[in-house]
């Protein structure tokens, strides 16, 4: 399934998750600041790196995991997800099917409540 996207030019985004300090890309969650803008109907390649194993989730989007570490996933392993366990470099293809609004943006980040409270989240706008 993900093979069909390999030949298309994709926007690439790298997210570095600092589990110890509760940061994404060395920043804390700020609900007034949009961290990622995406267009509805597009597909992006996100590369996730975490300092320690942690769950990662995206609201309002779905994705397939392309690879985890050196392991390239096979076609029979692929499924749409909204959460993935990141224990080393993880590469995902994110599809944005739903639009958000300025009043109701989506969030992305860790799925651990203590880390969310520390600010390990980002704001995602899809238009």
Swiss-Prot record:
GO terms for molecular function: copper ion binding; oxidoreductase activity. InterPro entries: Cu-oxidase_C, Cupredoxin. This is Uncharacterized protein HI_0731. It comes from Haemophilus influenzae (strain ATCC 51907 / DSM 11121 / KW20 / Rd). The lineage of its organism: Bacteria, Pseudomonadati, Pseudomonadota, Gammaproteobacteria, Pasteurellales.
């Amino acid at each position: 399934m993900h093979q069909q996207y390999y030949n298309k030019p994709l926007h690439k985004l790298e997210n570095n998750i600092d589990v110890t300090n509760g940061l994404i890309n060395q920043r804390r969650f700020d609900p007034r600041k949009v961290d990622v803008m995406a267009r509805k109907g597009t597909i992006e390649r996100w590369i996730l790196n975490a300092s320690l194993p942690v769950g990662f989730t995206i609201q309002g989007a779905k994705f397939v995991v392309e690879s985890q570490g050196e392991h390239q996933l096979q076609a029979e392993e692929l499924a749409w997800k909204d959460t993935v366990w990141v224990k080393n470099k993880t590469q995902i293809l994110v599809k944005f099917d739903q639009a958000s609004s300025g009043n109701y943006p989506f969030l992305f980040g860790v799925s651990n409540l203590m880390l969310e409270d520390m600010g390990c989240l980002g704001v995602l706008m899809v238009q």
